[in-house]
Amino acid sequence: MQTSLANIVLFSSLQVLLSLTCFQEVVEAASGKGFGDNIHWRTLDDGKKEAEASGLPIMLIIHKSWCGACKALKPKFAESKEISELAHNFVMINLEDEEEPKDDAFSPDGGYIPRILFLDPSGKVHPEITNKNGNPNYKYFYSNAEQVISGMKEAQEKLTGDAFKQRHTGDEL
């Protein structure tokens, strides 16, 4: 009898532990990781699928938990109402630490952090969309909300709607 009870307790404990582990993974994927929990963040794979299905461009942030520049950008980004509003026009992807893709397309001018890249709905990185008001040696480094907003507006203009479709209709032929 005691063995059965011990097995039930052990089995129940394992179920709870497994559930908590799965729940934590879901929460971490949805978490803003300091960049704003009010924004609907996706993983890279889910974000690419959603962008392709919805036709929305992707805004992708690559950062590290230990990075001072990343920590400085987080509250500026998270507190910006305009970034939050513009985020509705993008599939927002937030990659931290080991989530950073190894593909060179995601580090067009180096592997510094944080980097913000814009991708079209097919998942292609558009390296021409850069921080025009930043350091030309670090084209994808944004240090404040105004720079991010400017990049988002440029990406929205270049990667959505009829202008984007007209420039890329020949790509499919």
From Swiss-Prot:
First-tier enzyme category under EC: oxidoreductase
Residues in the signal sequence: 1-29
Primary location class: endoplasmic reticulum
Catalyzed chemical reaction(s): [protein]-disulfide + 2 glutathione = [protein]-dithiol + glutathione disulfide
One biological process term in Gene Ontology: defense response to virus
EC number: 1.8.4.2
Pfam entry (one): Thioredoxin_7
Transmembrane spans: none
Subcellular locations according to the entry: Endoplasmic reticulum lumen
GO molecular function, a single term: protein-disulfide reductase (glutathione) activity
Matching CDD domains: ERp19
Stated name of the protein: Thioredoxin domain-containing protein 12
Species, as recorded: Epinephelus coioides (Orange-spotted grouper)
